[in-house]
């Protein structure tokens, strides 16, 4: 079954589909978003900023997207950045210019999203470097995401809508930057140069900044096909993730409604993207981590290095209790399983199917997950073992063509999670995706 022949409606009822990461990010969301955005009218982002990243290949050309939705690469697609985002405008403009063409005419920015300034990035670096010296680093991308959300919730941040009236924006800007320079003892900061740049951004973007809530609801009323692109992933959610080793936004399904302003009843289908093994960038608990040659094998074969930071990712076995916890939050309808090909060549594959208390020996209740930073001190993973396979599976065209042991592994994941696996990624290229009937 060729996935390119199928519309998003072939995998669920309704026109509004969300693609959400179900682990610690880097699950490979970009590929399925890219595939489905060809068939959608509108592609949206609702959270985060340039700390996220997708690398998409179209017509043998690679595009690194950090702020723009994947749909921007298709002429029939309108793209929306929602109010839940923090936007580093220079990075956005650079991304627009790197793609070329008149793509800005297909882009709308929420007037309620917040502007991320260079000073936010300066503060982020200062804070992370201080934590590093104390041995308490979070492992942020130093893109200024946390400090920008901090000014937002402190009610001193500047919304993108302010940029439509430059004189008003200028007064807000000077007040904010002066306050932050004093608060963080920053003496070397070129406000005049940044203001000059923002005047050009004002001229370029003033007609692209709109009331996204009204726009989105009009599109919903017109029954447009809407693809919602989640940045980061569930276990990095500010509330539900492995706090404090998380991002600063709501990365789970609730962020869609608060970050785009659409009615929760309008979402028809939630796709949970799940990597066939587990990875994590930066610090924080990782109870199935492999610090041996198998972990190195997964990292090198899967090229597990950050799209945004190029940092090596920590690798480990797939964690079923994590997926059940995320399913409780996101109500995952179907699963896109990615990078199954990376497991080829392993003699044995472990699948974490539970956690046992080190103190009592009792198994953790289904749907619960130990997210506290000291969780590894109190729980140990329970594994089920699977025989591996040697074959290269990247040329398989159907689920039935996969090696028997690969099929057994996939079916076990499906059984434990209780949501159907619809797509399986078996290689790096866009067409290395099979549909499981």
UniProtKB/Swiss-Prot annotation:
> What are the cysteine partners in each disulfide bond?
none
Q: What keywords are assigned to this protein? A: Cytoplasm, GTP-binding, Ligase, Magnesium, Metal-binding, Nucleotide-binding, Purine biosynthesis
**What are the required cofactors?**
Mg(2+)
Pfam assignment, any one: Adenylsucc_synt
| Residues annotated for Mg(2+) binding in this entry | 26, 53
Q: Name one GO cellular component term.
A: cytoplasm
Active site residues according to the UniProt entry = 26, 54
Q: From the Swiss-Prot or TrEMBL record, what is one GO molecular function term? A: GTP binding
InterPro entries membership: Adenylosuccin_syn_GTP-bd, Adenylosuccin_syn_Lys_AS, Adenylosuccinate_synth_dom1, Adenylosuccinate_synth_dom2, Adenylosuccinate_synth_dom3, Adenylosuccinate_synthetase, P-loop_NTPase
Glycoprotein: present as a keyword of the record? no
Entry keyword Nucleotide-binding? yes
Q: What is its EC number?
A: 6.3.4.4
Other information: Parasitic protozoa lack the de novo purine biosynthesis pathway and rely exclusively on the salvage pathway for their purine nucleotide requirements.
NCBIfam families, per database record: PRK01117.1, purA
What does the UniProt function comment say about this protein? Plays an important role in the salvage pathway for purine nucleotide biosynthesis. Catalyzes the first committed step in the biosynthesis of AMP from IMP.
Q: How does it associate, per the subunit comment?
A: Homodimer.
**Protein name (database record):** Adenylosuccinate synthetase
Q: Organism, per UniProt?
A: Plasmodium vivax (strain Salvador I)
């Amino acid at each position: 079954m060729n996935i390119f022949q199928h519309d998003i409606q072939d995998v669920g009822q309704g026109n509004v589909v969300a693609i959400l990461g179900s682990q610690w990010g880097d699950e490979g969301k970009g590929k399925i978003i890219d595939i489905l955005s060809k068939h959608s009218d509108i592609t949206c982002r609702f959270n985060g900023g340039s700390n996220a990243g997708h690398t998409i290949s179209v017509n043998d050309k690679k595009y690194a997207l950090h702020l723009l939705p994947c749909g921007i690469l298709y002429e029939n697609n309108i793209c929306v950045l929602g109010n839940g985002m923090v936007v580093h405008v220079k990075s956005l403009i650079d991304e627009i210019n790197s793609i070329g063409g008149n793509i800005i005419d297909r882009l709308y920015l929420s007037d309620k999203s917040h502007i991320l300034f260079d000073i936010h990035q300066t503060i982020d670096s200062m804070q992370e470097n201080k934590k590093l010296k104390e041995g308490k680093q979070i492992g942020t991308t130093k893109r200024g995401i946390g400090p920008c959300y901090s000014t937002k919730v402190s009610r001193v941040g500047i919304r993108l809508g302010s940029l439509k009236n430059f004189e008003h924006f200028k007064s807000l800007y000077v007040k904010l930057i002066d306050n932050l320079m004093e608060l963080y003892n920053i003496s070397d900061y070129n406000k005049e140069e940044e203001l000059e740049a923002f005047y050009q951004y004002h001229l370029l973007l003033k007609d692209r900044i709109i009331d996204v809530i009204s726009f989105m609801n009009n599109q919903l009323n017109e029954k447009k096909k809407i693809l919602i692109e989640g940045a980061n992933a569930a276990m990095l959610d500010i509330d539900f993730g492995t706090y404090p080793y998380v991002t600063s936004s709501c990365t789970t399904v609730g962020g869609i409604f608060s970050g785009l302003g659409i009615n929760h009843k309008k979402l028809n289908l939630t796709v949970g993207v799940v990597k066939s093994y587990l990875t994590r960038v930066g610090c924080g608990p990782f109870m199935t981590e492999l610090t041996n040659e198998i972990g190195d094998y997964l990292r090198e074969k899967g090229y597990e290095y950050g799209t945004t930071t190029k940092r090596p990712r920590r690798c480990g076995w797939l964690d079923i209790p994590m997926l059940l916890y995320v399913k409780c939050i996101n109500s995952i309808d179907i699963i896109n399983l990615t990078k199954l090909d990376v497991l080829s060549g392993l003699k044995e594959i472990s699948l974490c199917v539970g956690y046992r208390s080190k103190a009592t020996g009792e198994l953790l209740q289904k749907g619960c997950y130990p997210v506290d930073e000291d969780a590894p001190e109190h729980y140990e993973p329970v594994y089920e073992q699977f025989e591996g396979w040697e074959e290269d599976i990247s040329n398989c065209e159907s689920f039935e063509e996969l090696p028997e042991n690969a099929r057994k592994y996939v079916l076990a994941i499906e059984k434990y999670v209780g949501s159907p696996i619809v797509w399986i990624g078996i290689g790096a290229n866009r067409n290395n995706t099979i549909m499981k009937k």
